[in-house]
């Protein structure tokens, strides 16, 4: 009998495919294997949130809320987990408190059990509304430390932040190592410090990008970690995660034995292996995403950001600029006060780095989002931004010091009015709130399909269709 069995959060239905194939796994591809996955005694199955919401309506023509309801029905014995960006919800801007509260309420009502909440800047003010709302709905709140390397980030910084999150109502703490920067002995020291500081469980989430994750996770387990994120082996490694089967085998017969059976996992592995072969054959998995890139320790690009950036550069015919962009990212990050690179700051810093390289002059063109980051719209940066840089970017406008959401008026009534002509369920207003440019087209196609209209040949502008 294991003295301290390690719990597993399986991420193959969310972060694994977000990292390796830009979040393109469909519900139809997931559904056949769900009954087998439901037999495994996971701590939780991460299957929703993050970029899945955007991908569903933008690329897959799926209703993300319907996806969640199907997952809830097909995985009745599992705790379903989502990734939530705090005040940014699943969109790319800060939202008013009433929108955040409503989203949490609807997520739990539709089947979510565990809400992993993070803020890109580790600003606790951006998590307070989401944590309170999740506590109220009875969900398990897993609050994240967005792990990164910089002159201002150390174990004391992370431990103090974890203590703050525990006091705010977190049920567990996740070390969110989105870029695979966490080294083995550093992980041991960090987990040891966290276990001395907080009384709640500690989870390790570490991407394999730099080839460190397996070693770091093992040292973290030895230091007292309670939960570990892994992905089924066909969609593991590279910019994804440590393989589930490998960890299960490594811990068998030890004090940390997970209790998971390799024979049961092998059925799931065989299914996802066929999907992997399909993704490689049709080009959805970029081979560059599958290898180890130790340069990650220099430019700190997380898995999902890397695969999306590769796709964007390929689509623009600018793949030859990849190395230049990767070298520019740390410079932009230093200018912006060392934000951890995770959504939305990864997109903000990454896009600005791309502009700096393509324009041939740094900050010749500055995105609205980068100005917002410097202005304080996304929260307090880990290090102060130099005044001369702030003045240059903001053209003399003063940055804010309060919680940005405190400057926002309640917005749900306005959003409901705007979305009313499309909405057929209460959740649609939230889809619209996060993606107001993309959602209307998705709603029109979905609603036409539900009404038996040929969505491919419908004339949405003139509201007509062939019969």
Where are these regions (language model features)?
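Conserved, mostly hydrophobic/aromatic
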Residues: 8, 16, 37, 117, ...
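C-terminal helical cap(s) of enzyme catalytic domains, especially alpha/beta-barrels
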Residues: 236-258
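Active-site beta->alpha loop and helix N-cap motifs at the rims of alpha/beta catalytic domains
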Residues: 49-166, 173, 179-184
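N-terminal amphipathic alpha-helix/helix-capping segment at the start of soluble metabolic enzymes
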Residues: 1-21, 68, 73
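Glycine-rich phosphate-binding active-site loops on the catalytic face of alpha/beta enzymes
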Residues: 117, 177, 223-241
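Catalytic cores of alpha/beta
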Residues: 153-165, 210-226
């Amino acid at each position: 009998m294991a003295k301290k069995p390690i719990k597993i959060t399986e991420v193959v239905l969310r972060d694994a495919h977000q990292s390796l194939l830009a979040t393109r796994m469909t519900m139809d591809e997931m559904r056949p294997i769900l009954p087998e996955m439901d037999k495994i005694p996971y701590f939780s199955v991460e299957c929703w949130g993050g970029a899945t919401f955007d991908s569903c309506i933008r690329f897959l023509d799926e209703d993300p809320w319907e996806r969640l309801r199907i997952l809830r029905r097909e995985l009745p014995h599992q705790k379903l987990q989502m990734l939530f960006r705090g005040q940014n919800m699943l969109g790319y801007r800060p939202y008013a408190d009433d929108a955040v509260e409503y989203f949490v309420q609807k997520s739990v009502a539709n089947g979510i059990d565990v809400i992993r909440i993070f803020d890109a800047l580790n600003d606790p003010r951006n998590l307070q509304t989401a944590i309170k709302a999740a506590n109220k709905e009875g969900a398990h709140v897993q609050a994240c430390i967005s792990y990164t390397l910089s002159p201002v980030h150390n174990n004391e910084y992370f431990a103090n932040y974890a203590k703050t999150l525990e006091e705010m109502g977190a049920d567990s703490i996740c070390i969110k190592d989105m870029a695979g920067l966490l080294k083995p002995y550093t992980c041991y020291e960090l987990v040891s410090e966290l276990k001395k500081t907080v009384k709640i469980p500690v989870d390790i989430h570490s991407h394999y990008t730099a080839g460190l994750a397996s070693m770091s996770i093992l040292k973290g387990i030895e230091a007292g970690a309670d939960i570990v994120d892994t992905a089924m082996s066909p969609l593991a490694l590279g910019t994804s995660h440590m393989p589930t089967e490998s960890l299960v085998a490594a811990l068998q017969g030890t004090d940390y034995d997970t209790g998971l059976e390799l024979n049961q996992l092998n059925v799931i592995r065989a299914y996802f292996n066929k999907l992997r072969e399909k993704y490689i054959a049709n080009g959805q998995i970029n081979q560059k995403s599958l290898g180890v890139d130790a340069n990650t320790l220099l430019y700190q690009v997380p898995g999902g950001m890397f695969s999306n950036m590769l796709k964007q550069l390929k689509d623009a015919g600018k793949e030859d600029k990849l190395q230049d962009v990767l070298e520019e990212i740390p410079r932009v990050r230093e200018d912006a006060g060392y934000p951890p690179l995770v959504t939305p700051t990864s997109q903000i810093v990454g896009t600005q780095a791309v502009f700096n390289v393509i324009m041939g002059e740094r900050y010749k063109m500055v995105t609205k989002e980068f100005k917002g980051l410097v202005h304080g719209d996304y929260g307090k940066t880990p290090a102060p931004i130099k005044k001369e840089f702030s003045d240059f970017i903001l053209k003399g406008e003063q940055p804010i010091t309060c919680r940005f959401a405190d400057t926002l008026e309640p917005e749900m009534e306005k959003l409901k009015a705007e979305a009313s002509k499309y909405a057929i369920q209460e959740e649609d207003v939230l889809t619209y709130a996060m993606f107001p440019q993309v959602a209307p087209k998705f709603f029109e196609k979905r609603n036409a399909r539900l009404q038996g209209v040929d969505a491919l040949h419908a004339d949405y502008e003139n509201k007509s269709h062939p019969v």
